[in-house]
């Protein structure tokens, strides 16, 4: 039962093969048995089973929708009433929100049952889920490896089938990279598609929530429930409701046939995504996936994204600048960690923040404060914003000759736990293929497409699919066609 997709689980509930309570109990037992992975930071069986009972009551009345009674885990960056909401930080280790984030509320309104809160890099700052105040998360495929970050708890939970789906957030790649490392499917929607209300902020012009699950079809179902305008989020976009499942299983064009369902699809391959720095085993796996797309009828087209290499310095100016402002609210006064001993008010601020924040968060606050300071704002922050606009223009130029862009989600497979902890720059370089997508506000997703080679033979590789603004339904169609022709997304770690 635990290996079933969301659609299969909902069908099992409708057929009375199990109840929502029994399903929740199954996953709670699996979570408890896999505590060594450290994927979850907070589980409350009573709260979960209460939601499951309510879902069973809905189903008994013949009511409910396509997700009623199906369990989900939430990244601990979404505030969730009843559960602690920590953002992976000591600063918020005992914080309980009086309200639900819009994403949480919408999924609960769709009938989903919350299993608990997943581990994450502190305030979503990291690429390995080693920056959490609650300990590192292990990759279920190889427990010596990282699961990616910052949504590493969510990716590990879905990969180990501790939950059929999970929420994540993506600021510079934090859905796509962990999805790649853990062999699951994850999508970052267009910026503004999913409400940020109740999402603990890192970098407000970049943060975006999205689903992580086994397949593109599962992600489409989840996005149906998650997306939509929210007047409480000033960056939320007013658009008509959309069915993200509407193209699944359909031919790309009227001239496509069953053997070549993607005939007419043009896939752009950026030269910059296949150059120096891309590991040989990742390149080989991505090449094999692209050949599969050609077999499905797609055409490969060379494109260029010339400012790709600048996305790292641009991101690491803009994101820390916004973080230094957003995290200024955590001062030990209204909420958050407060130092036990201090002199005056200023001393309390200093000690509370020094004790509450981890080293990576402190590093980014310092960088952000510096680039916003007098004399450096124009040289760094303003210049970064100008290049950000050029990066977005490069994508629009590329989309003139293709429908979607593809490439690796990460230049390597997951690295060993602790391998990059002493070298933050090497950690930052791991996001080179995802950062520009976030800076442009475009939708991007990662789908499992194989594994590394040699010593990395147990470590998954993800194919990144990038679409133009509001093109999620077509991206999901493209990913779904690949998953109908392959079974990479159905493979699970040993023992699962």
UniProtKB/Swiss-Prot annotation:
Q: Which InterPro entries match?
A: Amidase, Amidase_CS, Amidase_dom, AS_sf, GatA
**Which Gene3D superfamilies does UniProt cross-reference here?**
Amidase signature (AS) domain
What does the record give as EC number?
6.3.5.7
* Tagged with keyword Protein biosynthesis: yes
Q: Which domain of life is it from?
A: Bacteria
Enzyme active site: 75, 150, 174
The protein in question is named Glutamyl-tRNA(Gln) amidotransferase subunit A
BP term (GO), one: translation
Does the record bear Protein biosynthesis in its keywords?
Answer: yes
Concerning Pfam families, the annotation shows:
Amidase
The entry's keywords:
ATP-binding, Ligase, Nucleotide-binding, Protein biosynthesis
- What is known about its subunit structure? Heterotrimer of A, B and C subunits.
User: What is the enzyme's main class?
Assistant: ligase
Q: Which gene encodes it?
A: gatA
Source species of the chain: Burkholderia vietnamiensis (strain G4 / LMG 22486) (Burkholderia cepacia (strain R1808))
